[in-house]
Amino acid sequence: MDELLSMLNFLGMKDPEELFSDIPKSVRKKSIGIGGGLDEYRVIDRAMEIGRKNKTDMINFLGNGIYDRVIPEAVNYILSKPEFLDSYTPYQPEISQGMLQSMFEYQSLISDLMGMDVTNASMYDGYSALGEAARMAYRINGHSKILVPESSYDSKISVLRNYIWGLNMKIMKYRIGEDGMIDLDDLSSKIDSDTSAIVVENPNGYGILDKNIFGVKDIKKDAVLISYVDPISLGVVKPPGEYGSDIAVAEGQQLGIPMNFGGPLLGLMSFKMEHIRRSPGRIIGESIDSNGKRAYVMTLQTREQHIRRAKATSNICSNQALLTLAASAYLSIMGSTGLRKVALLTIKHSRMIKEKLSSIGVKPYFSTESFSDVMFRLERDVMEALASKNILGGLKLRQLISDTPMKDATFFTVTEKTDAAAIEKLAAALEVI
């Protein structure tokens, strides 16, 4: 109290309220309602009390962008090391060799996974990576039209539209056929001399592993082919580099990053070497120092904080360096064999849920192979009823694509963690609600 009075006297004031005299009383709150101070034990007890309101034991069939994957404990151990957890953007790379090496290894791993030449040091998330890819396509050819599949979610298109605002670019949708895959004839009819980029998804927004992506390179003309992929699926399906992609992007949350109220996320972005000078973000390179020893450096960082704004390729600031470490640790621990097993288990469980729900009259929307997100025909809304039975699932496609004609399309998502018992419980619940 003596300290408070001393400070007020120094300021020529008598009451702390005078500090806020320039704020109109009509907008000031008398109390913020958090009560008085508590000792450490009571604070922890109160936090635990609030935390117990969360339901953490529910069976999860939700996905469509964020997935419940197994994360090896070693990933969390590596992330918790203070030299990684506490470090910031390495503005002085010569004293940040450990962080730069981890980012370099990440770039190498993702390039291998995508089958592409180069990977940047990360984007904020998958959707923003797609937006940056569209801007990159514009820098490559200067055209204004972007073709996206009608299976793209509203949220994805919203972010894409926000990124291309100001470039006078326009978005046009192309058709997905009755088999759940790209209608190549419809796509071909919409490609013209003004087409800047063609976006393909694999799996697409309907959850389908799309074999028709292999035909896009033959009809794309001089448009940039941008692939939006599921990184786990690359354990078994062909990578973007093998079907002619110029740029490949993905959401990397599944690579060792837990679900946490929708974030933080990790944008993966890879591309052909010929486009490296038009790429956004940073690229970490390997060089030799003055003593002839290996040194990691920031090879390219053409953001507007470093060069003239008119010549910058992005405005990305602190990238997702810690999360690139999570992805590197996850991929290194799992290896190609482990990643393949995870992908195969996911496909096995998608087939399992199709078979089980079909047996109770809930039919898959497509006979084509699905990956994690499996779409069924189900007229009624079941999310609330399932939640009352401790099951999360039943997301409607119309919640993701507002103008879809498939009003009965309903998702149930599986991962390697989904087991037969969980699917049995889901089927039993759907039979009675």
Curated annotation (Swiss-Prot):
EC number, UniProt record: 1.4.4.2
GO MF entry, a single one: glycine dehydrogenase (decarboxylating) activity
Transmembrane segments: none
Catalytic activity field: N(6)-[(R)-lipoyl]-L-lysyl-[glycine-cleavage complex H protein] + glycine + H(+) = N(6)-[(R)-S(8)-aminomethyldihydrolipoyl]-L-lysyl-[glycine-cleavage complex H protein] + CO2
GO biological process: glycine decarboxylation via glycine cleavage system; nucleoside metabolic process
Enzyme class (EC, first level): oxidoreductase
Annotated Pfam families: GDC-P
UniProt keyword S-adenosyl-L-methionine, yes or no: no
InterPro entries, A to Z: GcvPA, GDC-P_N, PyrdxlP-dep_Trfase, PyrdxlP-dep_Trfase_major, PyrdxlP-dep_Trfase_small
Signal peptide limits: none
Biological role stated in the UniProt entry: The glycine cleavage system catalyzes the degradation of glycine. The P protein binds the alpha-amino group of glycine through its pyridoxal phosphate cofactor; CO(2) is released and the remaining methylamine moiety is then transferred to the lipoamide cofactor of the H protein.
Subunit structure: The glycine cleavage system is composed of four proteins: P, T, L and H. In this organism, the P 'protein' is a heterodimer of two subunits.
Family from the record: Belongs to the GcvP family. N-terminal subunit subfamily.
Protein name in the entry: Probable glycine dehydrogenase (decarboxylating) subunit 1
Organism: Thermoplasma acidophilum (strain ATCC 25905 / DSM 1728 / JCM 9062 / NBRC 15155 / AMRC-C165)
Gene that encodes it: gcvPA
